[in-house]
Each structure stands twice: as structure tokens, then as C-alpha cells.
From Swiss-Prot:
GO terms for molecular function: 2 iron, 2 sulfur cluster binding; ferrochelatase activity; metal ion binding. Was identified as a high-confidence drug target. GO terms for cellular component: cytoplasm; plasma membrane. GO terms for biological process: heme biosynthetic process. PANTHER family: FERROCHELATASE, FERROCHELATASE, MITOCHONDRIAL. Its cofactor is [2Fe-2S] cluster. This is Coproporphyrin III ferrochelatase. [2Fe-2S] cluster binds at C113, C316, C325, C330. It is found in: Cytoplasm. The gene is cpfC. Involved in coproporphyrin-dependent heme b biosynthesis. Catalyzes the insertion of ferrous iron into coproporphyrin III to form Fe-coproporphyrin III. Has weaker activity with coproporphyrin I, protoporphyrin IX, deuteroporphyrin, 2,4 hydroxyethyl and 2,4 disulfonate.
Amino acid sequence: MQFDAVLLLSFGGPEGPEQVRPFLENVTRGRGVPAERLDAVAEHYLHFGGVSPINGINRTLIAELEAQQELPVYFGNRNWEPYVEDAVTAMRDNGVRRAAVFATSAWSGYSSCTQYVEDIARARRAAGRDAPELVKLRPYFDHPLFVEMFADAITAAAATVRGDARLVFTAHSIPTAADRRCGPNLYSRQVAYATRLVAAAAGYCDFDLAWQSRSGPPQVPWLEPDVTDQLTGLAGAGINAVIVCPIGFVADHIEVVWDLDHELRLQAEAAGIAYARASTPNADPRFARLARGLIDELRYGRIPARVSGPDPVPGCLSSINGQPCRPPHCVASVSPARPSAGSP
């Protein structure tokens, strides 16, 4: 399978204070999120000057990917400029016939995979009859470079705290009903499997997995334990240092720089716990190599690169033109409330 271009498909984020509220309205449209909730989340962005780190990180990643291979790379987002519809229309106008789509989410499930498939279908409709064929690359939660980047980040973070620090992985929580209906439990099982792979690569036998950034009505069950509750429990058990690894995120979303670097760090300091946060891949050159490797799997018919571990968890396959890659695993059975301003 040959490609004329690559599309980096991401979530999007504001790049100035005046963009924050319109961005959040895009994210939550049709979900009945109260205005006061939007105001609260807006403050997280305004704390950083109204700028999400994600677009800048993605532009650097695109430059790295263009340096590593010969195909032009287009940039499209779901919720803010540059929109995916505009990117696909530009591809059409530039004569692109087939493009590989690399989404900035490593997982299967509705929020982390199927919504990107829906983005592809919507963008092709907007581009019309001459829209390019769009091939979404497979999820990569068990790719050797994904595991390597997080393992190295844990090692680097561990060097900043005392040697007996407890390792805590985090990923974005979702409603348990949404998790059951996709897979079932494909997202949470993939996250748990990836934590085992990364922990082993980093040399850890004991670790915790917690979930972060939930919202919505308290009566609606979400994946647990919440990382704030987990930290409270660790403090009660006498743990005096933690390394937090946000394995659910491939870049520094607001949920990372606010929920972890700000709120969770303050909680740890108040409890007398030394705190270190492992880096996400962001624009690490290895992340671009990972994307290039996924493209080459399809271009040259290569066997998918995966780290083998006990009790492996299946993932979705590549998909074409917004068609579900594996319907039992990636169905829009529910539209879970957007947890805050991001997505797993």
C-alpha cells in the first residue's frame, strides 16, 4: 500500500485566551455540560495564558516526522484550528490520493479510537467526491518504541526522587459503561497491559494503576481508583515518594500539566510526599519513528511491531475512510461525557 501524504490527527487546543471558551464549547457541544463547568475548566487553560501545549507539540512532532521520511505531513484537529476538514480539503486540492492517518492516541475504544474514525469520515464528506483515501494507522499501546519512551521517562523521573519511590501509572478515566461497551473493557485492559510492559521495561515489579480527570455526575460510575484517592491511600500507608507516569497520554495535555503537575503535586506536597512526574513522548524523535514504522507496516507488508507480554490484549486494526476497523471493538455505543477538556 503506497501513500502520497501523512495526516497527523489530534484533539486540538486553544492558542490564546480568546480561544478558550469557543474551544470548550466545541469539545462539549451537544453534551449538556453546564456553563459553570466550562468556566471552571477555562480557568485551567487561563492559568497557562490560554494556551494548550498540544498544538505546539504536534507541530514539532510533524517537523520531526517530515525530517525522517519523504511524505508531506498535514495537520488536522477535531476541536480547534487547524481543523481536520480543512486539512483533508487541502490534501484534495494538492492532488493527494491516499494518506496515512496517525492519531495522537495509542488506544482502542470509543473516545480514543472510534471518534478519530468518525473525524476521518466527516472530513472526507466535507472534501467531497475527490477526497483522498484515508487509512487510519493501528493503535500502538504495545509498540516497542511506546514502551521504551515511557520506560526511559520513568527512569529519568526516578533519578529526581529518593530510591524507594512508588510508581503510579495514570490514564484518562471514562464511564465504566462506555468501557464495557467497547471491547468489552478494551480501553482499560489495554492500559493495564501497557503498564505491565512499561513497568517491566523500567525494572519495576510493583506499581499502581489509577485513573484521572473524571467529571460528570457523581452517581455515574467511572473507572477507579481516582489518582487523588490513590495518593491519599499511599500517604496513609507511609509511602514518602511517588513517580507518576501518565501512560494514557502521548503528549502534555492540560490534564497532564494541570491535573498532575499542579493539583496532584500540591496534594503530594501537603501530604509530605516527594513527587516526580514522568514525561510523555511529546515530540521525542522516537515518537516520529514509531509513526513512520506504522506507515511502513502497511507500505511494505511488515509484521506489526509489538512487545510480547503475558496475557496480551488485542487492538484494533488499521481502517479505511472512516469505516470501523473491528466493529465489536470500536462501536459508538455511547457518547460518554467529555471528562474535562481532553480525551484519552
